[in-house]
Swiss-Prot record:
<protein>
    <recommendedName>
        <fullName>Matrix protein 2</fullName>
    </recommendedName>
</protein>
<dbReference type="GO" id="GO:0055036">
    <property type="term" value="C:virion membrane"/>
</dbReference>
<keyword id="KW-0597">Phosphoprotein</keyword>
<keyword id="KW-1182">Viral ion channel</keyword>
<keyword id="KW-0812">Transmembrane</keyword>
<comment type="function">
    <text>Forms presumably a highly low-pH gated proton-selective channel. Trp-23 may function as a minimalistic gate that opens and closes the pore. When the environmental pH is lower than a threshold, the BM2 channel would be activated and selectively transport protons across the membrane from the extracellular side to the cytoplasmic side. Crucial for the uncoating process.</text>
</comment>
<dbReference type="InterPro" id="IPR006859">
    <property type="entry name" value="Flu_B_M2"/>
</dbReference>
<feature type="site" description="Seems to be involved in pH gating">
    <location>
        <position position="23"/>
    </location>
</feature>
<keyword id="KW-1032">Host cell membrane</keyword>
<keyword id="KW-0735">Signal-anchor</keyword>
<dbReference type="GO" id="GO:0015267">
    <property type="term" value="F:channel activity"/>
</dbReference>
<keyword id="KW-0472">Membrane</keyword>
<feature type="topological domain" description="Virion surface">
    <location>
        <begin position="1"/>
        <end position="4"/>
    </location>
</feature>
<keyword id="KW-0813">Transport</keyword>
<feature type="topological domain" description="Intravirion">
    <location>
        <begin position="28"/>
        <end position="109"/>
    </location>
</feature>
<dbReference type="GO" id="GO:0016020">
    <property type="term" value="C:membrane"/>
</dbReference>
<dbReference type="GO" id="GO:0020002">
    <property type="term" value="C:host cell plasma membrane"/>
</dbReference>
Length: 109
């Protein structure tokens, strides 16, 4: 059986991980918005526009991959930690679902 201090320590770690992930997602969104705002095509032609769209598409795909990787890492860690966390009234699946819900809410913001 884990002591209350150990449970608090584990919960603190989980919250820190969630906060870091939310901060990273927000930071990636700010970068994307900044890239979108800084696009200036001097002599608009089809090639220049296509090149800029291609760069944006590539950056967006990298952002999506980073988010998916973070979700997978968090989910894996939550499953591992869920086996060691005993919170009265919550199952491992409920703890994992809480973590995923926090990520979804942060992603919507």
């Amino acid at each position: 059986m884990l002591e209350p201090l150990q449970i608090l320590s584990i919960c603190s770690f989980i919250l820190s991980a969630l906060h870091f992930m939310a901060w990273t997602i927000g930071h990636l969104n700010q970068i994307k918005r900044g890239v979108n705002l800084k696009i200036q095509i001097r002599n608009p032609n089809k090639e220049a526009i296509n090149r800029e769209v291609s760069i944006l598409r590539h950056n967006y795909q990298k952002e999506i991959q980073a988010k998916e990787t973070m979700k997978k890492i968090l989910s894996d860690n939550m499953e591992v930690l869920g086996d060691h966390i005993v919170v009265e009234g919550l199952s491992t699946d409920e703890i994992i679902k809480m973590g995923e819900t926090v990520l979804e809410v942060e992603e919507l913001q």
